[in-house]
């Protein structure tokens, strides 16, 4: 992982740990999770890696290998307003977690994505990867649903993306060689194993050459149009 090598070059020490959150694909159910529909999905073996080390002074200092500008803020004094950059996902995660738990320890780190940005829920992956590291250095344990809801709140309430919980659920619940089935109305879920009677298969993901951000594709307008269509 390049993030580990860059971390060692920059900080002249081994990272404390490397956090990981996979990307996800959703064969059926995309865009109906925010209308309490039933979805399925699975995680893939690519995702977000973050090499990090705790900082006892409470400072979060992260550099992305995919975006310019280093993120830096106090974990217990997150700016109230988003800043309009990639690090809003980190700030939102820290703010939502800090509303429930006392955060004292920050972290320094290098974060990287292994595929082009957009289409595989990379924003949710960044948040969950960062949350898992922030929880670890502060001695906090989140149950799976609490992790999902905290990550979702970071996007909804801080970043300003009106997403549902499909992305976060796939990334938290998914298991190798299983398909996740989730009812977003009551949050019940099932991990369906690959049948021994199935023929071998592979999942192919194609990059169109276009990168996008949910903040720039009128995602909220898309939801409004979908709701109007239902009516």
What are the roles of these predicted feature ranges?
Residues 101-102, 194-200:
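Short glycine/proline-enriched loop/turn "hinge" motifs that connect secondary-structure elements
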Residues 125-127:
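FabD-like malonyl-/acyl-CoA
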Residues 221-224, 228-231:
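Single conserved hydrophobic/aromatic residue that forms the stacking wall/gate
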Residues 179-197, 206:
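A short helix-breaking turn/cap at a secondary-structure junction
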Residues 29, 36, 190-193, 213-216:
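Short helix/loop capping segments that flank catalytic or ligand/cofactor-binding pockets
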Residues 25, 186, 208-212:
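Glycine-rich beta-alpha junction loops
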Residues 1-120, 131-144, 149-159, 163, ...:
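ATP-binding N-lobe of GHMP and related small-molecule kinases
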């Amino acid at each position: 992982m390049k993030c580990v090598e860059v971390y060692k070059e920059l900080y002249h020490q081994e990272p404390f740990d490397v956090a990981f959150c996979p990307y996800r694909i959703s064969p059926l159910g995309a865009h109906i999770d925010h209308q309490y529909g039933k979805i399925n999905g699975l995680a893939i073996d690519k995702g977000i890696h973050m090499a990090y080390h705790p900082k006892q002074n409470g400072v979060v200092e992260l550099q992305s290998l995919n975006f310019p500008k280093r993120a830096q803020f106090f974990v217990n004094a997150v700016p109230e307003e988003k800043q309009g950059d990639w690090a809003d996902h980190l700030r939102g995660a820290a703010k939502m977690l800090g509303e429930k738990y006392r955060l004292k320890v920050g972290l320094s780190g290098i974060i990287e994505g292994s595929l082009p940005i957009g289409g595989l829920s990379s924003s949710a992956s960044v948040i969950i990867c960062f949350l898992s590291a922030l929880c670890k250095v502060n001695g906090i344990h989140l149950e799976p649903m609490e992790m999902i809801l905290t990550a979702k709140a970071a996007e909804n309430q801080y970043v300003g993306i009106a997403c549902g919980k499909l992305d976060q659920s796939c990334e938290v619940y998914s298991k190798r060689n299983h398909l996740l089935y989730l009812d977003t109305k009551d949050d019940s879920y099932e991990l369906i194993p690959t049948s021994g009677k199935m023929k071998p298969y592979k999942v192919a993901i194609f990059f169109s050459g276009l990168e996008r951000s949910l903040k720039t594709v009128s995602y909220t307008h898309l939801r409004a149009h979908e709701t109007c269509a239902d009516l």
